[in-house]
Amino acid sequence: YNEGYRYVGRYLTGYVGSGSTARPKAMTKEELSAVFSAGLRVFAIYQDNNPVVSYYTYEQGLEDGVKAFNAAKNLGVPEGEFIYFAVDCDMMDYQVTANAIPYFRGIREALKGKPLYYKVGIYGSRNTCTRVSDEGLAKSSFVGDMSTGYSGNMGYRIPTNWAFDQFHEYVFTGASVNFDLDK
């Protein structure tokens, strides 16, 4: 908070690395508590896949919607917060139509009627975020603008519902910590 930040974006599930170097990337209850104790807010990110276009289907959206909901609830993410579902691959416009939009329809269906409600957001390229949001399937966009070579970022405007725009990563050095930080 003292460094000027107000939000912390963290993954709900998953691992980075593979084999003996695999380590969890998921936020812990202790980490969430520390975020709140520091006066910060959290936004949750759901990405539990090796992002390829074929992953994104209606059926996968149903499954991921339930997994993300359960992870957020079990972690203690406050009701009403966004979960940003990641579409972290370069989709051509026709693939957004054929894959990303059905995936988010599955997420919407999976979250219908849940007793603790989270809002659906999207992480992805400018075009993917815009198209999914224009379908009414995401209320907020976390734009992956660091992926400057993605066709979905080239020549497309930033979505009107953008909340976060990831455009740079650097090593943050604090009083007793160093870590990669996306801006």
Predicted regions and their residues:
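Substrate-binding cleft of extracellular glycoside hydrolase catalytic domains
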Residues: 10-92, 97
